[in-house]
Amino acid sequence: MVFQNYALYPHLTVEKNIRFPLENLKGAARLSKEEMKKRVMEAARMVQIEELMDRRPGELSGGQQQRVAIARALVKMPRVLLLDEPLSNLDARLRLKTREEIRRIQRATRITTVFVTHDQEEAMSISDQIAVMKEGVLQQTGRPQEVYDDPANLFTARFLGTPPINLFRGSIRNGALFIGTEAVLPAAGLSDQPVLAGIRPEGFLLHEQGPLSCGLENVEIMGRDISIVCSHPDCQTSPLRAIVSSESLSQLPSGTVRFALKPEKVLLFHPETEQRLRPRKEARNEQ
């Protein structure tokens, strides 16, 4: 297990910190000094800290300390490795680099690894399978992209995604999704009812005749994409953000901007239970 604060022994060298778990093995698991040295060097090579073996934790950077903690966990050759928010003490640039390192180590060792984090970007980028929890209750499991595209409830939809999902008060009427007075998408297979409509930032398309009209507040240039910051009276998240290609910048009007929506990026939820609303199968097949 690797803790958030690494829990290294400050008076021991890196080599002795890594070796410490092996010195406490009992019975048949006990190793000779030669076997311990070999195991320690293998773990150090795995996390690329061979040149730091004679240093003490106080002489190391945060990223180096984190790698020592991982080596100490790996040296026992565990069947399961638990990483409990191991990157939370690192700055943004080092977090990104160390995230890649952890992924490399996991692939090299093929040890089943449980990575605990409150950072959804870390969870999405590092995992093969993701488990979303709320107050100790499992909400959903699956591959990161699957959970992002098809969340089971509003909590999961809000947790995953940067910028976060935009949330609108809406209603289903006569087989269409209404936001305010505008019918923005077909909604066959759902009965007439109030809904919460979640729209991913990448789910907007600039369109002169688009059904969703918003007040333009700001445009943020992001290089390949632009973030359009808008307002809408029925939007419950502030600000409303739409991510579109930078090629669309020349199409932006002033004052009011109109959008068409990508149906696969619009998610409907029950306003009270916040569970996902899905059309009847027979209605989906008819479309």
Name each model-derived stretch.
Residues 97, 150, 158-159, 207, ...:
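Residues that scaffold the ATP/ADP-binding catalytic core of kinase and kinase-like folds
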Residues 4-155:
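ABC ATPase nucleotide-binding domains
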Residues 149-172, 198:
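C-terminal boundary and immediately downstream tail of ABC-type ATPase nucleotide-binding domains
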Residues 176-287:
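Non-catalytic connector elements of ABC transporters
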Residues 54, 161-166, 191, 222-224:
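Short flexible coil/turn linkers enriched for glycine and charged/polar residues
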